[in-house]
């Protein structure tokens, strides 16, 4: 049976490639970049799982509904 790599391993491998691709350049804002790139697909997937119900999605994520709404707007995931 094949098991999928966990999310942390996927992120680690992508960071290794990211730093390799920089070819010695010093990056800026890596923390925010990673959070934003992980957060958007997470929010999109959870919203799909919840059929667009923000209250249900917020509960699933452990966020306040207003916080979720702010993040959805930030990532342009709301019309």
Regions found by a protein language model. Name each.
Residues 1-6, 13-79:
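Bacterial C-terminal helix-turn-helix
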